[in-house]
Amino acid sequence: MTTQAIAGSCLCGAVKFAVTPPFAAFRYCHCSRCQKATGAAHAANAFLPAAQFKWLAGESLTKRFNLPGAKRFAVAFCTQCGTRVPHKTGENMLIPAGLLDRDPGARPENSIFWKYKAAWYVPPQDMPKFDELG
């Protein structure tokens, strides 16, 4: 795993940040809230101490949504393009791993809330693979 800073950004590039591994955790979350928040079968989130995170641009363009009634669920997004962006959770920053501009060297350690996985989810090792669409 690298310990050099890794840049990341949202889809439109207005929100930019850097993280310095190692991560405290890196996991897939299959809970119904993460499915709704991502529009996918699971979230891929890395966590690291806030001291290992730095906003480079666009922090003022982020908006946080705290789910009413939830003790620990929130999402943040870029107000220009809607991409989920990092946010503070406890003492750590939650980093949607797909925002990182290069391989962090770490791999997800586990899948949590597996019993709630989407009924249509097929683990990747069980699917045909193609390098590009069509």
PLM regions and their residue ranges:
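A short Gly-Trp-Pro
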Residues: 1-134
